[in-house]
Structures are given as structure tokens and as C-alpha cells.
Amino acid sequence: MQVLVDADACPVVVKEMLYRAAQRVEVCVTLVANQYMRTPPSRFIKSLQVPAGFDVADDRIVELVSSGDLVITADIVLAAAALDKGAYVLDPRGSWFSRENIQERLTMREVMEQLRSSGVDTGGPAAYAQQDSKAFAGQLDRFLARHAPPGAVA
């Protein structure tokens, strides 16, 4: 099991939690981004820089992900592709994407896109808050307790 992170838009606090978790449970965390990402020195943490371009990082994550891996992303289309490959998908606010909710989220994304293209100001996501950070940390810890490699300290 590995953790793949859609790192370009991932909050710094989430990346820091993932770095600590990688060391604690000895699981590989790979940040995929179209810009350089400085990571702490660790055999469990790596950064993969991809060329700039629409969905290049997402496409690379889909290439790398396997069944049972964990993907961290807020991108609904990437989440759907990762679920199709048998991965678990958690957003940085601590909400799980699942086979049960992905279609609804894709539909809502399409509706919002249509509203924006017709000139409606739909606003943006709420600012990342401490409660989001706590929710993510809790979900990550529960996941790693169930799925960490044998002998790891979750």
C-alpha cells in the first residue's frame, strides 16, 4: 500500500501530517505535482514533478495507483479514476470518496460547471479550517490503523 498525493493544491498542513504518518507507519508517500516540492529527507517520502499541463499530475497518479492504495485529492474526476482502479480516496478535508457517492459528486461538479459557464458566480470552496485539518487527521489515522504494513506502529 502506498499513499499518492495530488500535491499542487494540497494544503501544507495536510502534507505535513502525511510526512509524519509516513515515518510513523513506514508507508511510502509520493507527492505528485507540476512544480518542485521540497520534502523532508526520508526513505518513505518522495516527490514526483511532472510537466505543467492540464491534468498531467492527475494522469500520472492514475498510472501509478493500484488497488488498495490511498489517494489524497479534492479533484472529483481524479477520485473517480482512482476508485475505478480499486484505490481508497480521501479529500484534504477528511471526506471519503466512494463508489456510493462519486456519481453524485460528478453530477454536482457538472451542474456547477454549467452554471459558471453561463455566467453565474458560484463562489469557491470555503477556506481550509482547523476543523478540516482535524477531520483529515482522524480519517487518515483510522485508515492507517487498518491498512498499515504489518509491524508498523499506527
Swiss-Prot record:
Domain of life: Bacteria
Entries under Pfam families matching the protein: DUF188
Xref: InterPro entries: UPF0178
Family of the protein in this entry: Belongs to the UPF0178 family.
Full protein name: UPF0178 protein H16_B0290
Phylogenetic lineage: Bacteria, Pseudomonadati, Pseudomonadota, Betaproteobacteria, Burkholderiales
